[in-house]
């Protein structure tokens, strides 16, 4: 088969990897809705979903059937094109961002030299999805929720980026595999970049609009915020997109600060690399859910003040100290 060139084989393998990884991420995001409700019930000493199947295991299927048969309604007063585009961007941008995550030494969708910058670009696109949803709905609660969300996301993305610049300064690369290899050769970044880790996880919770930073969706004030007018599959895309964001941020925490696939016995059992990565990612997913179960929601002004007055100075100090140490080591 002369037409089957090495370049074509590479393209086919990349497409197959992309499909497998993206399907796995979507399935994980959907399953998280059931896992979260079960864990919240366990931690809050109540039942949670327990009617559909053993331990409510088929609750996800029931939810999907219900959502599929709900009317996919678009308000007559909405801007229909932008109204439809918003959930596609919200879910699609986070799915595409997962392409840079190296799952094992040999498995990953894309090995980009601008890996971290690519993540920042995709995370920035979610702001447009929120603004589009709020503005196109032609609803005052949706608009207020989208304004809150965009202001919060932009504020926290500032030090989301700065919190990783210490890692970039030490490694000298934006490539995710280079960062993992540096941790394998030296030490996991949770130790030298502890303050960067703390600020990144705070920013990750805020950017994904998770409790306690779910101000854009504050039910008591804004009646579910920017997706109040959404129903059916469009609302489902926002819903699953939020959980995909949790999986993405958890995978990045595992990769950037805990060595990614690195762990013991990889020389003799290389297949363990996938389980190390999955276990680390799963730990941070559980942490997201625990934060929701245990912390109250602050006021919106407190959320914004915490961003600019506490987290931003902390990331700047961490970056300055890291830069000074890197320069001192070079000399």
UniProtKB/Swiss-Prot annotation:
GO molecular function: NADH dehydrogenase activity; oxidoreductase activity, acting on NAD(P)H, quinone or similar compound as acceptor; quinone binding
EC numbers on record: 7.1.1.-
Keywords assigned: Cell inner membrane, Cell membrane, Membrane, NAD, Quinone, Translocase, Transmembrane, Transmembrane helix, Ubiquinone
Protein name per UniProt: NADH-quinone oxidoreductase subunit H
Annotated coiled-coil segments of the chain: none
Places the protein is found: Cell inner membrane
Mode of membrane association: Multi-pass membrane protein
Keyword check for Cell cycle: no
Self-association state and partner proteins as the record states: NDH-1 is composed of 13 different subunits. Subunits NuoA, H, J, K, L, M, N constitute the membrane sector of the complex.
UniProt GO BP: aerobic respiration
Family indicated by similarity: Belongs to the complex I subunit 1 family.
Main location: membrane
Catalysed reactions listed for this entry: a quinone + NADH + 5 H(+)(in) = a quinol + NAD(+) + 4 H(+)(out)
Transmembrane segments: 7-27, 81-101, 114-134, 154-174, 187-207, 238-258, 271-291, 310-330
CC annotations in GO: plasma membrane
Function recorded in the entry: NDH-1 shuttles electrons from NADH, via FMN and iron-sulfur (Fe-S) centers, to quinones in the respiratory chain. The immediate electron acceptor for the enzyme in this species is believed to be ubiquinone. Couples the redox reaction to proton translocation (for every two electrons transferred, four hydrogen ions are translocated across the cytoplasmic membrane), and thus conserves the redox energy in a proton gradient. This subunit may bind ubiquinone.
PANTHER family attached to this UniProt entry: NADH DEHYDROGENASE SUBUNIT 1, NADH-UBIQUINONE OXIDOREDUCTASE CHAIN 1
């Amino acid at each position: 088969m002369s037409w089957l060139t090495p370049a074509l084989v590479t393209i086919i393998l990349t497409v197959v990897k992309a499909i497998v990884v993206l399907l796995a991420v979507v399935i994980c995001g959907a399953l998280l809705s059931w896992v979260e409700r079960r864990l919240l019930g366990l931690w809050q000493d109540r039942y949670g979903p327990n009617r559909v199947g053993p331990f409510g295991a088929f609750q996800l299927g029931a939810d999907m059937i219900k959502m599929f048969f709900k009317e996919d309604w678009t308000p007559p007063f909405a801007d229909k094109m932008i109204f439809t585009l918003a959930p596609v961007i919200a879910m699609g941008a986070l799915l595409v961002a997962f392409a840079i995550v190296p799952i094992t030494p040999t498995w990953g969708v894309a090995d980009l030299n601008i890996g971290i910058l690519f993540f920042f670009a995709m995370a920035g696109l979610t702001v447009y999805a929120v603004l589009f949803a709020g503005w196109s709905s032609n609803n005052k609660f949706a608009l207020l929720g989208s304004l809150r969300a965009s202001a919060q996301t932009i504020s926290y993305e500032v030090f989301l980026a700065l919190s990783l610049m210490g890692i970039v300064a030490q490694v000298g690369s934006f490539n995710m595999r280079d960062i993992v290899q540096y941790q394998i050769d030296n030490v996991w970044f949770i130790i030298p970049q502890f303050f960067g880790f703390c600020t990144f996880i705070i920013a990750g919770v805020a950017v994904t609009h998770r409790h306690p930073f779910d101000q854009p969706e504050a039910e008591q004030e804004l009646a579910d915020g920017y997706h109040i007018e959404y129903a059916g599959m469009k609302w489902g895309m926002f819903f699953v997109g939020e959980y995909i964001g949790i999986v993405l941020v958890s995978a990045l925490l595992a990769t950037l600060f805990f060595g990614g696939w690195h762990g013991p016995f990889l020389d003799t059992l290389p297949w363990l690399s996938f389980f190390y990565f999955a276990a680390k990612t799963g730990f941070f997913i559980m942490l997201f859910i625990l934060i929701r179960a245990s912390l109250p929601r602050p006021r919106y002004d407190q959320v914004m003040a915490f961003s600019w007055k506490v987290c931003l100075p902390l990331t700047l100090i961490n970056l300055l100290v890291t830069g000074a140490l890197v320069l001192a080591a070079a000399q």
